[in-house]
């Protein structure tokens, strides 16, 4: 069986899903949901329940690996939300193309990483 890249596939659905996951991560939705289901939320002695951190998406830095249709659309939507977007240059590149940030620098600066590149032998770490 041969697996191929499908250019232009899910260019709306995948970026929207990525943004949903970013909100879930930054707002600790899994923890909140778990505590609501188990009833822990109702044990709170005050009107609010604060067991998990909530951090703003706006002002966060997103590292995008892959600047094709999907990576570009994720970056565009993230910028609309007020995120700083860094597109990663190839690992071990000797020069950095315009519009890209060195690979290691993206790893250092980004609060969140999203991967939108094919898994090829040259991209394996």
Sequence positions of predicted segments:
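Structural signature of beta-strand start/N-cap positions in the alpha/beta core
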Residues: 61-63, 84, 111
């Amino acid at each position: 069986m041969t697996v191929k890249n499908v250019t232009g596939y899910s260019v709306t659905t995948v970026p929207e899903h990525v943004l949903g996951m970013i909100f879930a991560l930054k707002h600790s939705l899994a923890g909140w949901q778990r505590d609501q289901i188990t009833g822990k939320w109702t044990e709170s002695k005050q009107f609010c329940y604060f067991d998990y951190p909530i951090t703003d998406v706006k002002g966060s830095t997103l590292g995008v690996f892959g600047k094709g249709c999907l990576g570009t659309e994720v970056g565009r939507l993230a910028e609309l939300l007020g995120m700083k977007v860094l597109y990663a240059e190839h690992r071990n590149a000797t020069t950095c193309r315009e519009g890209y940030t060195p690979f290691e620098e993206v790893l250092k600066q980004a609060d969140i990483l999203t991967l939108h590149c094919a898994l090829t032998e040259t991209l394996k770490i």
